[in-house]
């Protein structure tokens, strides 16, 4: 088996990040049910989804190379926040992130027909205090809509971040170092 993989993701960020790793890949999207189970912990949730996306790729017939699935959630007060469903939801989220530190959890999974291997990377991100105006203007930029927690650290949302501890790449959607390590372990095992 060569180093080439499949990327089971619709995310343009994950495509860019995987390109940055120099791994040859083919991208396709999978349609996974992303709802959280009752009482499911954020860590378990994000890891389950990454595995589900990878295994859905295998189930679609992409079986000749490892399939990479990944998922990102923002966690504050033990609650997982996905993409905002509307401006109200977004405003509520940004007010919770404002002036606080939250965690971004990104899970990565590789799957083939006979095995699946995954890991979760946690990064702490601290936001400055945001005004109502800043929050409203940011929503109108169109950037928050498709991003976990309603912000993009790599875009206009970057100016809200006063401190980050951990993997910047994991916040954007794919931790470079950990993904490469996981693939090496997967291919060896
Ligand atoms: C917090 C944060 C999230 N994000 C993105 C990463 C993920 O693409 C997205 C979270 O949604 P995900 O459901 O993890 O991924 P996705 O729907 O974009 O792609 P797919 O499921 O097909 O792989 O939020 C940023 O781009 N920047 C950030 O700062």
UniProtKB/Swiss-Prot annotation:
Active-site residues from the entry: 71
Cofactor: a divalent metal cation
GO molecular function: dTTP diphosphatase activity; UTP diphosphatase activity
GO biological process, one term: nucleotide metabolic process
Catalytic activity of the protein: dTTP + H2O = dTMP + diphosphate + H(+); UTP + H2O = UMP + diphosphate + H(+)
Enzyme Commission number(s) from the entry: 3.6.1.9
UniProt xrefs under Pfam families: Maf
Location of this chain's protein in the cell: Cytoplasm
N-terminal signal peptide: none
InterPro entries reported for this sequence: ITPase-like_fam, Maf-like
Key words, A-Z: Cytoplasm, Hydrolase, Nucleotide metabolism
Site annotation Important for substrate specificity: residues: 13, 72, 154
Keyword Hydrolase carried by entry: yes
Subcellular location, principal: cytoplasm
GO CC annotations on file: cytoplasm
Protein's job: Nucleoside triphosphate pyrophosphatase that hydrolyzes dTTP and UTP. May have a dual role in cell division arrest and in preventing the incorporation of modified nucleotides into cellular nucleic acids.
HAMAP family: Maf
Family: Belongs to the Maf family. YhdE subfamily.
Protein name: dTTP/UTP pyrophosphatase
Source organism of the structure: Pseudoalteromonas translucida (strain TAC 125)
């Amino acid at each position: 088996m060569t180093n080439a993989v499949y990327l089971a993701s619709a995310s343009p960020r994950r495509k860019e990040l995987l390109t940055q790793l120099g791994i040859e890949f083919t991208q396709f999207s999978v349609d996974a049910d992303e709802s959280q189970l009752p009482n499911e912990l954020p860590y378990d949730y994000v890891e389950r989804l990454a595995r589900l996306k990878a295994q859905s790729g295998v189930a679609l017939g992409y079986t000749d190379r490892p399939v990479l699935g990944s998922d990102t959630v923002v966690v504050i007060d033990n609650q997982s926040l996905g993409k905002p469903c509307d401006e109200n939801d977004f405003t509520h989220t940004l007010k919770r992130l404002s002036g606080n530190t939250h965690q971004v959890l990104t899970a990565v999974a590789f799957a083939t027909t006979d095995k699946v291997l995954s890991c979760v990377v946690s990064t702490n991100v601290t936001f400055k205090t945001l005004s109502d105006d800043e929050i409203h203007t940011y929503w109108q930029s169109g950037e928050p809509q498709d991003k976990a927690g309603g912000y993009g650290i790599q875009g206009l949302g970057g100016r809200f971040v006063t401190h980050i501890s951990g993997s910047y790449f994991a916040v954007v959607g794919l931790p470079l170092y950990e993904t490469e390590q996981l693939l090496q372990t997967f291919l060896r095992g």
